Amino acid sequence: MPSGALDRLMKLRDDPYAMARSWKERTGSKVLGFFCCYAPEEMMHAAGALPVRITGENRDISKSAAHLQSYCCSLARTGLDMALDGTLSFLDGTVFVHTCDTMQRLSDIWRLNAGFAVHADIIIPVRFETDSAWAYMIAELSSFKEKLSEFLGPIDDAAIIESIKLYNKNRALLSEVYDLRRANPEVLPYDQALWIVASSALMEKSEHNALVEEILSDLKEAPSPATDDRVPLFGIGSVMDQWEFLKMVEESGATFIDDDFCDGRRYFDTLAREDLPPVEAIAHRLWDRKTCPCKHAPSKERAKCIVEEAKASGAKGVIFFQFKFCEPHAFDYPHVKKALDAAQIPSLNLEIEQGSVSIEQMRTRVSALVETIKS
């Protein structure tokens, strides 16, 4: 009999920060928000805080328009709106990692207007794989550790190592969910698999680990479903929270078999080493993991990696989900698209924006891609 763990996680989608608010009320400890998956969550956790990811919201803007231009991405605009209208009032502070110009400037606006007790910026290098970039990354993470200590008290290296182990366990469990579904997409709707990953950054990791272990047990015990004849697709983008759209793709005769979303596989990609000093271990993971359009690593050329990953997943087509006014993904698209064309992998680029997705218009375009692949 199913444990109900998946149902408990899916209910969180209606109120993403419910677990964080409950945790704070229960423990009296601090909650720190972050936007980017390059944030060193293990350090925050080791300091006794709960790291919680801010992913914006599908909402109309009420307060942030006075601070941000209309050509900023909806992730920045809705995130700031949530801070200004009290939705994020449970936060004690926010950690910004440099990703793009919008987020870099949002950090200053946030610091001056959101009113949280602590504010930190981490400037992760844009270009990896040089000695100077490595030294700079170590210095930035060490500086962040010191700043956390000023706010939360001394952070013991042993505590960071334990947090690394806890987060590694979570990454391994999430990888198992994705790999299980890749082998048999019928076992779990894609939007639920993606939410299992996204919810990991919204609650205490030990609680999430327990729930995912139950979900995996349920999935492994479930009867084998019928053969899946849907077209397997690969998704590319930053944060993906357009759940109705993902369901629509499955209604169109396709399903996502894997992805390169920063709240999907890219979030749990690569374990941190447990045989190194903690700051180095965290730095190595950020250094070694899959890069996003905001970073560059010569040995992991992004277009080539995307093609290899799409092929390995068994995907027959690719859909790009590009936030309107997202410059990093806009610059990334032509290069990756060219590589996909050379590999004869059909693709579709969809512009999305939180709060204004036209499902039916996109349904027509997705159906056309599916029919093209089938033919």
Feature roles, as predicted:
Residues 60-69, 129-133, 265-272, 358-360:
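Short, charged, surface-exposed secondary-structure boundary motifs
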